[in-house]
Amino acid sequence: MKKEFIFGVAILVLLSGCTQQPAEGGGGEMPSLSGKKVLLIIAPSNFRDEELFDTKAELEKAGAATAIASRQTGTITGMLGGTAKATLSLSSAKASDFDAVVFVGGSGASSYFNDSTAQRIAKDTAAQGKVLAAICIAPSILANAGLLQGKNATAFSSESGNLQSKGANYTGSAVTVDGKIITANGPAAAKQFGKEIVKALQ
């Protein structure tokens, strides 16, 4: 009888532990970026697939809402054949509607190097103290807008001279963070790039 009593108590303790575990583990916590909105700007053609999709995945995994903008709305094809739907045009996109703005690279991003609308969005984002990010060749958009002067920044190697001529300290690193400006050097760095944007938004 005594053994049966001890066995019954042990079962109750085990069951009690199982029912309490989810609460102790914080399973009901909201993602860290719940309520945050991020704008991803892609070229009108030939954006770099990983730089959009991997970065976007990291942001959404953390709970952020994302939107894609380009020169025109509609379906756009990347360099590797992936497609993305731009729901906003550059002319209608406003930095004030988002917590961060990300310029995606790829060969097509060069069309924004001296684009006044792209530069206006970049300048507004920085002026409003929000997170501003660019990857691959896209950091040249920020450099040409005068936003990298005196800043540590990286980019695809072809852009190193332009960044330096615009006053940036070119690091050559995969990802570089300087305050709220985040830059990365190419598709292999896209996941880390996304993670750094997540950190900056927390």
Language-model features: locations:
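Short, thiol/selenol-centered motifs that function as redox-active sites or metal-ligating centers
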Residues: 135-138
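Extended, subdomain-level signal for the structured scaffold at the beginning of enzyme domains
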Residues: 19-128, 141-145, 162-172, 176-202
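Short hydrophobic/aromatic-enriched beta-strand-loop microsegments
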Residues: 148-157, 170-173
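Positively charged n-region of N-terminal signal peptides that target proteins for export
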Residues: 1-4
